[in-house]
């Protein structure tokens, strides 16, 4: 009997009905799947019936068990199994996969946000279905005006639609986690940057992330006050007036398109200011 290791954030899901619901939610056109944290291999087994799968397991003991359990699938090329930290592998040349892939995972809660953000930024990742803490799931899947709407919600919705599919009862895990878990799905339909992308290049995308960090720095304060720490307040007030936005708006009350528009205007204002300064 394998015991879950706390330092790896392990909670093994073995409920067949829940595992089947995850498989059924994967888009029909997916060919390659990347799985992070296969654990005992219950989800891996189901994935391998349909998809070529690449799995990353950080726990060496579990890796050895999986290597034996799926020896045939590894031999015939249906499964690529690595004993590696997926977060570290993301930073390596080639990332998690040399091909386009769909991410499916029961993510450790302590690294879930970081992993989802990596997947969002990874151009080879076509989307994801992951199980995470419900509190985090709500932040990624929230819509404008929801109290949970955040910078994470905006980043998740830029390329497609992020939705919370269903909750998973703690008693379906071994050991049971102390929090409710939820499964979210993100299917990308747009490119983040490039010729047909939302942003011109990676530098502009990073600037937008910094803009969002400023916007949501203090969720209880007004958006105008938050942004004023990084941008000229008078210029912002003019932007708000031209867009018919109330100056007492809280960060969660503005929609994604309006955030993009304010960012674009402030970026253009900054570029004009730099050009004027270079001419003096």
From Swiss-Prot:
Pfam families in the record: RrnaAD
Location in the cell: Cytoplasm
EC number of this enzyme: 2.1.1.182
Gene Ontology terms, MF aspect: 16S rRNA (adenine(1518)-N(6)/adenine(1519)-N(6))-dimethyltransferase activity; RNA binding
Primary location group: cytoplasm
Known catalytic reactions: adenosine(1518)/adenosine(1519) in 16S rRNA + 4 S-adenosyl-L-methionine = N(6)-dimethyladenosine(1518)/N(6)-dimethyladenosine(1519) in 16S rRNA + 4 S-adenosyl-L-homocysteine + 4 H(+)
GO cellular component: cytosol
Transferase listed as a keyword: yes
Chain sites annotated for binding S-adenosyl-L-methionine: 11, 13, 37, 57, 85, 106
Keyword annotations of the record: Cytoplasm, Methyltransferase, RNA-binding, rRNA processing, S-adenosyl-L-methionine, Transferase
Keyword S-adenosyl-L-methionine: yes
Family: Belongs to the class I-like SAM-binding methyltransferase superfamily. rRNA adenine N(6)-methyltransferase family. RsmA subfamily.
UniProt function note: Specifically dimethylates two adjacent adenosines (A1518 and A1519) in the loop of a conserved hairpin near the 3'-end of 16S rRNA in the 30S particle. May play a critical role in biogenesis of 30S subunits.
UniProt protein name: Ribosomal RNA small subunit methyltransferase A
Biological source species: Campylobacter concisus (strain 13826)
Gene giving rise to this polypeptide: rsmA
């Amino acid at each position: 009997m394998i015991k879950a290791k706390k330092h790896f954030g392990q909670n093994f899901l073995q409920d067949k009905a829940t595992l089947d619901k995850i498989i059924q939610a994967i888009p029909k056109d997916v060919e390659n799947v990347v799985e992070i944290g296969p654990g005992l291999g219950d989800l891996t087994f189901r994935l391998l019936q349909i998809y070529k799968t690449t799995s990353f397991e950080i726990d060496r003991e579990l890796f050895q068990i999986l290597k034996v359990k799926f020896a045939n699938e590894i031999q015939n090329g249906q499964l690529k199994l690595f004993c590696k930290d997926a977060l570290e592998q993301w930073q390596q040349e080639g990332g998690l996969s040399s091909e386009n892939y769909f991410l499916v995972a029961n993510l450790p809660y302590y690294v879930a946000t970081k992993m989802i953000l990596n997947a969002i930024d990874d151009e080879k990742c076509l989307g994801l279905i992951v199980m995470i803490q419900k509190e985090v799931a709500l932040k990624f899947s929230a819509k404008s005006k929801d109290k949970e709407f955040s910078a994470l919600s905006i980043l998740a919705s830029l390329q497609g639609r992020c939705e919370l599919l269903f909750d998973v009862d703690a008693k379906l895990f071994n050991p049971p986690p102390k929090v409710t878990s939820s499964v979210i799905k993100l299917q990308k339909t747009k490119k983040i940057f490039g010729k047909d992308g939302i942003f011109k290049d990676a530098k502009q995308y990073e600037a937008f992330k910094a803009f969002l960090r400023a916007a949501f720095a203090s969720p209880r304060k007004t958006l105008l006050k938050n942004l004023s720490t990084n941008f000229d307040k008078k210029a912002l007030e003019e932007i708000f007036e031209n867009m018919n936005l109330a100056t007492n708006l809280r960060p969660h009350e503005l929609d994604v398109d309006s955030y993009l528009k304010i960012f674009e205007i402030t970026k253009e204002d900054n570029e004009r200011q730099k050009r004027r300064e270079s001419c003096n």
